UniProtKB/Swiss-Prot annotation:
InterPro entries tied to this protein: Ribosomal_uL5, Ribosomal_uL5_bac-type, Ribosomal_uL5_C, Ribosomal_uL5_CS, Ribosomal_uL5_dom_sf, Ribosomal_uL5_N
Function of the molecule: Binds 5S rRNA, forms part of the central protuberance of the 50S subunit.
Any one GO biological process: translation
UniProt KW Transport keyword: no
PANTHER family for this protein: 60S RIBOSOMAL PROTEIN L11-RELATED (PTHR11994)
Family: Belongs to the universal ribosomal protein uL5 family.
Subunit structure: Part of the 50S ribosomal subunit; contacts the 5S rRNA.
Name of the molecule in the record: Large ribosomal subunit protein uL5c
Domain of life: Eukaryota
Location of the protein in the cell: Plastid
Molecular functions (GO terms): rRNA binding; structural constituent of ribosome
Keyword Ribonucleoprotein: yes
Entry's Gene Ontology cellular component terms: plastid; ribonucleoprotein complex; ribosome
Length: 179
């Protein structure tokens, strides 16, 4: 069993039950999925950079990313129909817990000038978004192999109904929030 999943079952669930007075086991919030997405910007013209960004996200997540292509042309942005403009990966189950464990314990401490996660990342429905400015904080990425420094967005989707429930869940799992 994943370390983070066992922490959730043994420590976080009892705390949430006492804090929010849940009567049913299925009311306790849990993490449904983690979505890692990144846009290409101007680097979508170079196939070499595009391939390196795909390999980086595959190494970070352990899963092949899905390319997002433009639905129509926008001449102001030099985007043609069918051109790749981004990619995303959706993680569930053990891969999700493994990624979150590496994110909390390895990646966040490697960030420069990191004072904790911002509480404003909650969306009002119990989900949390965090934006990363560079991919070099992940131990799977070698700094010498980075062709273009691009960030990514990580969305943590929970079953929590409110931001307070989601905050308690993520704080119990070890997310370093700045309060």
């Amino acid at each position: 069993m994943q370390k983070l999943k066992s922490i959730y079952i043994t420590k976080v669930c009892p705390i949430l039950v006492n804090e929010f007075l849940y009567t049913n086991f299925f009311e306790i919030p849990k993490i449904n999925k983690v979505v890692i997405s990144r846009g290409f910007g101007e680097s979508c013209n170079s196939s070499k950079i595009l391939e390196s960004l795909l390999v980086e996200l595959k190494n970070i997540s352990g899963q092949k990313p899905i390319l997002c292509k433009s639905k129509n042309s926008i001449s102001n942005f030099k985007v043609k129909k069918g051109m790749p403009i981004g990619m995303f990966v959706t993680l569930h189950g053990d891969k999700m817990y493994s990624f979150l464990d590496r994110l909390i314990n390895l990646s966040f401490p490697r960030m420069r000038d990191f004072n904790g996660l911002n509480i404003k990342g909650f969306d009002g429905f119990g989900n949390y978004n965090v934006g990363l400015s560079e991919q070099s904080i992940f131990p799977e990425i070698e700094y010498s192999s980075i062709l273009k420094n691009k960030g990514m967005n990580i969305t943590i989707v929970t079953t929590a109904k409110t931001d307070l429930e989601s905050f308690s869940l993520l704080k119990g799992l070890g997310f370093p929030f700045c309060v």
